[in-house]
A protein has these predicted regions:
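Beta-strand-rich recognition/accessory modules
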Residues: 122-147
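Extended hydrophobic-aromatic, low-complexity segments
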Residues: 11, 39-42, 66, 74-79, ...
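Aromatic/acidic polysaccharide-binding cleft in carbohydrate-active enzymes
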Residues: 1-30, 34-56
Length: 147
């Protein structure tokens, strides 16, 4: 029921009179839809940072890597290494310079998903910089040599 999902903690959108405001939760919900119908992709974590959460999935030739930086104050550097190098397709990142920011009727787009930066390629891995308090989805695609 839509009525139960509006104006409550962790709702996808809020109403304020005539206004319907998408929340950051909506953006996360939208970003994570790429995992529907996909298979979990196993991975090995080296030098695990307890403030970074990682999960990945694969659907056909598309690989999706989600990175969540739970630190309110520190950006994080992540190295992604694949057995066979896929091509980078796109990245989406949800963050705000102030983790306390929220969307309201006066500022409906203060915290919204943005196009993320392409990861740098160094040696044999992708180098990713995660903003503080951010959620990111990186989309890669298997290359012809991997199929």
């Amino acid at each position: 029921c839509v009525a139960q999902s509006v104006n409550v903690l962790n709702s996808l959108f809020l109403t304020d009179g005539e206004h319907c405001i998408l929340t950051p939760n909506y953006d996360v919900f939208d970003m994570y839809q790429v995992h529907q119908g996909a298979y979990t992709l196993g991975f090995e974590e080296k030098n695990k940072d307890p403030e970074v959460c990682i999960f990945a999935s694969i659907k056909n030739d598309d690989i999706y890597v989600n990175l969540v930086n739970t630190s309110y104050s520190e950006s994080k550097k992540i190295e992604l290494k694949f057995k066979q190098c896929p091509e980078f397709v796109e990245a989406k990142t949800l963050y705000s310079k102030d983790p306390q920011n929220y969307n309201d009727a006066k500022h409906p787009n203060r915290v919204r998903c943005k196009e993320g930066k392409a990861p740098a390629w160094e040696k044999d891995s992708f180098q990713i910089a995660l903003p503080a308090a951010s959620v990111s989805v990186y989309h890669f695609r298997k290359t012809e040599t991997e199929k």
